Amino acid sequence: MTLNIILLGPPGAGKGTQASRLEDEHGMVQLSTGDMLRAAVKAGTPIGLQAKAVMDAGELVSDAIVSGLIGERLDELGPDVSVIFDGYPRTAAQADALDGILSARGRTLDHVIELVVDEDALVDRITGRFSCARCGEGYHDRYKLPKVADICDVCGSKEFKRRPDDNEDTVRTRMVEYRAKTAPILPIYEARGIVTRVDGMAPIDRVNDAIETILGTAG
């Protein structure tokens, strides 16, 4: 069964983690417009050359070019590969364009899954995280400190780092931006009855189980 899904969630909700698990466990492919754009420009595809010319001129890439990128990538993958859309669509016009792109290839949008988070809890989750500067092992001030203070459990390094944008102001600004971006498209998909919300603050395995159940891929 080929699935076409949109996975929504603000930064820090665990969207990337869940998309990666679906890729690893079910062979699904995550379609990130940013990644596709960079890949097309690097490969010098017809759409990529169009996009490069626009960006070199300091202009925003049009919906038509983004739609072309998605169509190009779906054609590369073929009809039997399930896909996860990330960062697209963000407007009603893009949602309409996506319908056309999928329909032209015998596909339909099956599910829109939103990872819902509590804003205060998300601030706590993000502002407390840090990682080993050498191996990248992740830690948290409240939930996962190194077993021996200031020494990485995995590689023994004493050097740790935090992302410069892991601060409360940035997190709350991103939440506002996320709501603004999803506001135009959620009602469209809710009217079709294909939106399901999952508690993004639950443990990773539980979130994955909920998504698997929605998609019918559990077990």
From Swiss-Prot:
Monomer. Pathway: Purine metabolism; AMP biosynthesis via salvage pathway; AMP from ADP: step 1/1. SUPFAM superfamilies: P-loop containing nucleoside triphosphate hydrolases (SSF52540). Zn(2+) binds at C132, C135, C152, C155. Catalyzes the reversible transfer of the terminal phosphate group between ATP and AMP. Plays an important role in cellular energy homeostasis and in adenine nucleotide metabolism. Its EC number is 2.7.4.3. Residues 128-165 are annotated as: LID. The gene is adk. Keywords: ATP-binding, Cytoplasm, Kinase, Metal-binding, Nucleotide biosynthesis, Nucleotide-binding, Transferase, Zinc. It catalyses: AMP + ATP = 2 ADP. It is found in: Cytoplasm. GO terms for molecular function: adenylate kinase activity; ATP binding; zinc ion binding. ATP binds at G12, A13, G14, K15, G16, T17, R129, A202. It comes from the Bacteria. Residues 32-61 are annotated as: NMP. Its main location: cytoplasm. GO terms for biological process: AMP salvage. This is Adenylate kinase. GO terms for cellular component: cytoplasm. Consists of three domains, a large central CORE domain and two small peripheral domains, NMPbind and LID, which undergo movements during catalysis. The LID domain closes over the site of phosphoryl transfer upon ATP binding. Assembling and dissambling the active center during each catalytic cycle provides an effective means to prevent ATP hydrolysis. Some bacteria have evolved a zinc-coordinating structure that stabilizes the LID domain. Belongs to the adenylate kinase family.
